[in-house]
Curated annotation (Swiss-Prot):
The lineage of its organism: Eukaryota, Metazoa, Chordata, Craniata, Vertebrata. Belongs to the eukaryotic PMM family. It comes from the Eukaryota. CDD domains: HAD_PMM. Coiled coil: none annotated. GO terms for molecular function: metal ion binding; phosphomannomutase activity. It comes from Macaca fascicularis. The modification N-acetylalanine is found at residue 2. Homodimer. This is Phosphomannomutase 2. The modification N6-acetyllysine is found at residue 149. It catalyses: alpha-D-mannose 1-phosphate = D-mannose 6-phosphate. Pfam families: PMM. The gene is PMM2.
Amino acid sequence: MAAPGPALCLFDVDGTLTAPRQKITKEMDDFLQKLRQKIKIGVVGGSDFEKVQEQLGNDVVEKYDYVFPENGLVAYKDGKLLCKQNIQSHLGEALIQDLINYCLSYIAKVKLPKKRGTFIEFRNGMLNVSPIGRSCSQEERIEFYELDKKENIRQKFVADLRKEFAGKGLTFSIGGQISFDVFPDGWDKRYCLRHVENDGYKTIYFFGDKTMPGGNDHEIFTDPRTVGYSVTAPEDTRRICEELFS
């Protein structure tokens, strides 16, 4: 059972509310709207706002009390934009270019069954780096993900970057199936908590699937300000919520 007092449920998107990069199902959408009648709900994802809309609907800011794309670097509350932070003013152009150039030369040397396009996506709060390229098809995405599980392509890439850019104040975080994020230290999903910690919640629940060390849900999952639940799929999220808030 849930703890008494005002509470907020924060959900990761991919693998938690939806299948990776897929749209939310009608059943899950309806379930969350019912849940919202009992408790405040919010989403926090690494993706940009457009991708969150693609997955959760164009009216996402009306359907959730809080929407935090890019780990909360972009923040919406009660349907209105709260704030937007950007990576270039924080890190400076020189470091960003060094990072982009290094990633592109590393990707050029990696042999994969397939490579597509958009290897680096520049977002407000992070760089998203994909060895196969974000424009791959769903089938190619799954093929890469299966290969990555065996060969640790992303893990090796990240280990190399951590060595190369040690001491530069950067965090490298693997999430989803085909990419990893690079952002300033402290700009992980915990960043979104600054937007909610003064809103009077007694408990902030967090649900995510990449909660292991190195996963992009790990920091917020283990943060003392949250009660974390590790899930394997949207069905799992729903089951736990039903147990907590029935």
